[in-house]
Amino acid sequence: LLRYSNPIITADYPDPDVIRVGKDFYMVSSSFNYFPGVPIMHSTDLVNWELINYVIAEPVAGFNKVRSGEGAWACSIRYHKGIFYCLIPFPDEGLFVSVSIDPYGKWSKLKCLYEGKGYEDPCPIWIDDKTYVVFAFVKSRIGFNSKLGLIETDETLSAVLSDNYSIIYDGTEKDQTIEGPKVYKIGKMIYILAPAGGVEHGYQVGLSSRSIMGPFRRSVLLKQGDNGINGPHQGALIDIDDKKRYAFIHFEDQKELGRVVMLEPADIDCNGNIKLGINSLPVRDGVVLTKEDARSIDYSDSFDSDKLSLIWQTPAIVEAGWINPSKNGLVMNSRFQSLDDFISFPYRLCQKVSSYHQKASLILDLFLDEGDKMLFGIIGRSYLLIGVKKSRGKLYRIIATVNQEEVIDEITGTNGIILDVKYDYPNLCSCSENKKSVMIDKEHWTGLHYCIGLITHNSSSRGFAVLKRFTISK
């Protein structure tokens, strides 16, 4: 057996959903306004995960600007009759579907299944000859929450057959903010697992019935204990083999770092009761399947491919041509923005901060025009950036935060420039230049990312940089 320690993924992969197909496990998670959207990961042991693809590869209307926190919320993945289905909510647009016969291959363009504001966390289920989708509600969009809704669809999730949604569970009294439902049919029973009570201090609710319409028997399956693991939020029940063995994967809120992924033991007893964790409490360590040819997410990048590594995303849809990957480095072209605001700047490569304590270094060659700023750093709802700007014909090394830009020194060389930043959990970002550090707080930082961008105030700039290597170290 493989021993593991939680979290199994120390990076911001919120709202994970996981399925098993044969000996393979596939995970999807929320991506919000980052594109490509909805990452897909693969594992053979539930502990070691490799990033293999994204569901959303094509542009989505309305996301050519940075819309922080919007976009693709908690999705679900299912496998039915040889087809992978991913059901994705956009809280301001509706519930969307993408399908594929190969999770490593091309996924279909998003199709709206159920249009409207305020629907979130959809999960499909096929029961006998009918197909249903269970979902939750976003109070800020629709005026209420704490309820679970249901619609009937055709078998391929192409059309809604219901005249309207039905409320199948009302958690207003016992389970405030119940959301994130995942629905399963095991034997003759229907099970819905859903978190309630809020992200940081909530618990996992189990609902069971012989009918998708209820009535449901309610129980609390997983709750916060005294071992420092906060509210066990939404996730997935997984049948880990054909021997009726189970596991549960969920996220835990880790402040500025984001929502990390946790693995819990699970079981269904002879009376059909689901058991999660140990005595309904999350675990720090456990054992699971035998380790098989384990791979992991590679966060470093040598920029020696003509394709961009899967680890990089952008915070909005941007046009092709602003970057050009090659075997000799990745060329990043400058892009104009009048405001000196890096958060709203869409032309930046981003990847998740992936450890409680780590250093990230970027090596690059610079070919800047007047008014260009090459910036690298850590960004959430605020940022700490180190970089180089060209002003009055000279190059200056700079450090920038939201409210301040500081010139460190003038530089003369343009090749082999090294920029580095460091993150120390829970609330410190720093860079070695001038030993600059910034205390961060969750009001302004969430789901931290490393980011790289070349912004300019010169509308005729033809400046560019060649990225040579990005390295993660302790």
Q: Can you say where each PLM-predicted feature lies in the sequence?
A:
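Carbohydrate-active catalytic/glycan-binding domains of CAZyme proteins
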Residues: 1-474
